[in-house]
Amino acid sequence: MVSSDWPIIMCGDFSEKFFMDGTKEVKHRREFGHQGGELSEQGARGTVAGLYSEIRDTMGLSMVNLIYRRMATEEGVLEWVWAWINGAINSLDIEDELAQLSDGVAWPAVKSVQRASLPLLGIDEVEEIKLASVLSQYNRGNSLNLLLLNAFLSQLKKRKVLQGPRMQPLKARRVHVKELPPILDLGQMGQDTAAVVRVLAKYVSPPGSLMIPSLFRHLAHWPGFLALVAPHILQSIANGEVRKVSSCLKERAVSKVSALRLQTTDIITEKVPSIDIRDYWAEEIDSYLQKPIPEMIVIGNMIESILPDEEK
């Protein structure tokens, strides 16, 4: 199976009235999503657009992670998974859980660049703020998903597909979340930058498939910086550091999930997908949890450490 992270581009005039028809919205999701594809944030309408907005607000992010954009291509899957995740995130002290997940982790060591060098990479003060925000949000999002999706699979394996954490009032995660620049398609990048993105993606994709992590596509906005960090990423992958640290994160996440005390209720969603669809997405989620999600946490934090310290 080939999993593409390329955005789904929508054309034509799509009115709100069109998407009030549930049948037409399902058709839309099937047309603009396919097995291995995604439904982009720009292409989302109706129910999916509402879910994306709720995901961003609840998780304290300005973007929707790839795994959820993938789920949105299959009718009912994102609704089903997010109903459980939304309940979980609101029944936990999630900020404390996140802090414990990364507490004391030794990220692969990389020397930070001097602030005076950033203009040589095409990064001024404004762009540095944007870049730092991209990195911090991906590190947060991937860490949340490592915890919450592991918890979801744990409950699914116990056949608690109709059970989930009791829904709590929505909690504001941040007072303000900076808007991120758009995710770039490979065709919107320079040829050399697209080649770098493809190479990096090759080493973090799940076994037997190809996906392009959205972080790399976001970093393509700063091709000079991406070219600078790419060798460090590849070296840390080659020497086993990324695998070692990501394995530690996976073990911590699984251990924390087993200790979580989630309040449950009987029904959290009106419709649960068929067993075949549940099995497919359980495997898909697990493949992301085994490699790209934990490895991108390591890579994201490593890249973040390259940015200048406040005093530099």
Provide a role label for each language-model segment.
Residues 1, 6-312:
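Hydrophobic alpha-helical segments
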